[in-house]
Amino acid sequence: MTEEEIEQAAYKDYLEIRTRVQIAFERFAQSMRISGKHKRAIHSLSESHTLCTQARNTWNVNFRYTGYTPDGKINIVCYLYIPLRRENGVDYLFMNDPKCFKVERVSSHFLQRYKERYLDPAGIDLKGVHPAIYFMQNNEDRRQAYYLPKNWTDEELAEKCFLVSGQGLSLIKLCGKTLTYITFLDQENLSRYKAQVCEEEEYLHLMGKAKDSDILGLQAISKKLCADIE
């Protein structure tokens, strides 16, 4: 199947199961809205289902309660995913927002690099969780990076970018409604140049959020970064 055909098939499944996912989501959210008189067992803070579509695709659904937001709203994340078997490995398709169609495709190459460059060096015990799920659960802070390689073509600039998170850099490609994770670069194993990209990304991110009282401190960080450039 081509990328377009995969997206079309995912969209058909999305239209078929989104209402069921939303109903299950609301039911789980309601069960988590508890008063201070009640306590929840750890195992009950998540819930899993499987949904089979008319196309005989079996989607896995996982809801996780992560607490309350500062304004008192309950915070629950949804992971809706399916394995996509390819000739060179198994990719994973995610449709994590039942209210909006968007596909995130985690490639087998990305997962291999994520394992080699982060999970194994860090000694992460997945406790039975698939690496693709672990990545989604532990990189919710990922955001688009400012950095773009100077040797990228116009086509690459239109389709690709880097996402930066606490665990490292993810190279992604956006085509239609599908975001594909191509490869992973762990901050601890980057070259000195790429490591500095991560530092600069964090600086620029902080600059975007900074108050006037923070600017002098951030300017000092900027001078240090510039001084480190060879």
Regions found by a protein language model. Give the residues of each.
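Ribonuclease/tRNase effector modules and their secretory precursors
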Residues: 1-230
